[in-house]
Amino acid sequence: VNKIIFKKNDLIYSILLMPFLSKKNQINLLKKSYKSLKSGGGFICINKIQSSNSQFQDIFNQLYFDFKKSKKISSNDILKKAQSLRSVMTLNTQAEEIKNLKKVGFKKIEVFFKYLNFIGIIAVK
């Protein structure tokens, strides 16, 4: 993250990247993104998140498992992937995602998509 150089931009998007960064690097990337946006520029991110409620988390996980099964992915393959990702992903809650955007300076923030454990957020500088 520290090696990434941004030019001035009207729009930056991050698709399923943040969960693969440490909390510190998530904030660093958000800071760099915010600083490189022109006034009125937008930041769009789509991330996998952790539910703030364990019961909902279990329901969402099961529904996502069922979705993958409907796509003819074997139970074994689904479990292997889930296990391999568990050790490399740092998931935030929806509230943490919004708090991080506010922390780096964004004031206009809106959730535009939410499905199970996935969220889309747009923030404007």
List where the protein language model places each region.
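C-terminal alpha-helical "lid/dimerization" subdomain adjacent to the S-adenosyl-L-methionine
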Residues: 48-104
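A short acidic, Gly/Pro-enriched loop at the edge of an enzyme's catalytic core
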Residues: 2-12
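A short glycine-rich, Lys/Arg-flanked "PGG" loop and its adjoining helix->strand segment in the class I
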Residues: 27-39
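Active-site micro-motifs of SAM-dependent methyltransferase domains
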Residues: 2-3, 18-19, 50
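Conserved beta-strand signature within the Rossmann-like core of class I S-adenosyl-L-methionine
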Residues: 40-48
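Core SAM-dependent methyltransferase catalytic element
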Residues: 98-125
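A short SAM/SAH-binding and catalytic strip from SAM-dependent methyltransferases
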Residues: 10-25
